[in-house]
Amino acid sequence: MAGTIEVLIPGGEANPGPPLGPELGPTPVDVQDVVQTINDETDAFDGMEVPVTVEYEDTGDFSISVGVPPTAELIKDEAGFESGSGEPQENFVANMSVDQVQKIAEQKSSDLLSYDTFNAAKEVVGTCTSLGVTIDGNNPREFKSRMEDGEYDDILK
């Protein structure tokens, strides 16, 4: 490959402007073709920030690989809110169910450092802590402690 460009793009909303356009401008690829291909491949992630890698050749040929959105984006989408809390330990912006945590853990399993769903769920809960999202009405730190005590083993293992 002649080069690689990595960017975060809102799903289905790539355009020739920043951050993609300035990166693609000096390359031999047709910018509109790249934008259209990215939009087609990321349409399912409507509005979520999605990592996209564009690899291109000197001939103008290109290939695109789409990653899984960041955990925070999946949580925002699943719980239905726009941005996290400015004071995540005091002001909570949303609540998620254990099933939603499990769903995100399974979606992200290939990108996380965890070897199983239980530990992947702990990573998701950690992100919930940073965003100010409760789980089944519990503070995420309290929920994580209950996970470690085995309360959710039947669901998350």
Swiss-Prot record:
Report a single Gene Ontology molecular function: structural constituent of ribosome
What Gene Ontology terms describe where this protein resides (cellular component)? large ribosomal subunit
Q: Where is this region: Disordered?
A: 1-28, 138-157
One Pfam match: Ribosomal_L11
InterPro entries to which the protein is assigned, alphabetical: Ribosomal_uL11, Ribosomal_uL11_C, Ribosomal_uL11_C_sf, Ribosomal_uL11_CS, Ribosomal_uL11_N, Ribosomal_uL11_N_sf
What SUPFAM superfamilies does the entry give?
Answer: Ribosomal L11/L12e N-terminal domain, Ribosomal protein L11, C-terminal domain
One of the GO biological process terms: translation
* Basic and acidic residues composition-biased segments: 139-157
Q: What SMART domains does UniProt report for this protein, alphabetically?
A: RL11
Q: Whom does it interact with, and what assembly results?
A: Part of the ribosomal stalk of the 50S ribosomal subunit. Interacts with L10 and the large rRNA to form the base of the stalk. L10 forms an elongated spine to which L12 dimers bind in a sequential fashion forming a multimeric L10(L12)X complex.
Name the family the entry cites.
Belongs to the universal ribosomal protein uL11 family.
- Listed name of the protein: Large ribosomal subunit protein uL11
Gene behind this chain? rpl11
